[in-house]
Design a protein with these regions (language model features):
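Alpha/beta enzyme core
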Residues: 2-226, 230-261
Length: 261
């Protein structure tokens, strides 16, 4: 049964929230079958699937396409759609683009930073919002941990409180000191989802490509549960060898069909 924002808020302090990203229908289908309650269709798709050097190249059209694909694979899972760079510059622009993601199949939208006017506007128009503070990939110059100085930690903590006050029902905390994430989590009444923010958050999110070991780089705070890139390489090499040696297709295997017309 698909969870709504109220269900997810009710999990705070009771049960940890597991979240994975997905960008395609087959992956989304497997994630739903595993019982993961939330899928994030992140703008990370630009870097891990589309070959961009930055998430800033991702467009709203890209996000609509991938949200739709994920929805077709996971009809009973709460799906969060990322608002890509430049699509939430003001409340009305954000509403137009958030509506596009909802119509594509998202149940809620996520946006980076303490843009409280935008969050309030979306919530006022019945669009559930997930906030995001700490490291903000859309505008960050480096991917180093943030919040290590007292001033920076205080700023991030205040941002999280402002995002909650504006109406977000959940907040992603990215690549900040674990102690800071724990303090923020205790101070908020909405769930926090950590990515590189330690075990004291209310839940955790991983980029599915990182979890699968698919690609050639994975953040140090991620975990690889498999190494799918090695499997793809093995399969491709075996296929090539069998084609060259005429082992594939096998003459033993015959496919027959019946014309029903």
């Amino acid at each position: 049964m698909k969870m709504n924002p109220q269900d997810l808020v009710a999990m705070k302090g009771c049960k940890r929230i597991a979240m994975l990203t997905a960008y395609t229908c087959p992956i989304a289908r497997s994630i739903e079958e595993a019982g993961i309650p939330v899928i994030l269709v992140g703008d990370t798709v630009g870097m891990v699937e589309m070959g961009f050097d930055t998430t800033r190249d991702v467009t709203i059209e890209h996000m609509e396409y991938h949200v739709g694909a994920v929805r077709r694979g996971a009809k009973n899972t709460h799906i969060i759609g990322d608002l890509p760079f430049g699509t939430d510059v003001d409340p009305q622009t954000a509403l137009i683009n958030a509506t596009r993601l909802i119509e594509a199949g998202a149940d809620s939208v996520k946006l980076e930073g303490p843009n409280t006017r935008v969050i309030e506007h979306l919530v006022d128009h019945d669009i559930p919002v997930v906030g995001h503070t700490g490291l903000l990939p859309q505008t960050a110059k480096t991917f180093k941990q943030v919040g290590r100085t007292a001033a920076e930690a205080n700023r991030i903590a205040l941002e999280a409180q402002a995002i909650e006050k504006a109406g977000a029902f959940m907040i992603v905390l990215e690549h900040i000191p674990h102690a800071l994430a724990g303090e923020i989590t205790k101070a908020l009444s909405v769930p926090t989802i950590g990515i590189g923010a330690g075990a004291d958050c209310d839940g955790q999110v991983l980029v599915i490509n990182d979890a699968l070991g698919l690609g050639d780089y994975w953040p140090p705070f991620s975990k690889q549960y498999a190494y799918v890139s090695k499997t793809v390489l093995k399969v491709a090499r075996e296929f090539s060898e069998e084609v060259e040696s005429m082992k594939f297709p096998s003459n033993i295997i015959q496919f027959t069909g019946t014309d029903k017309n």
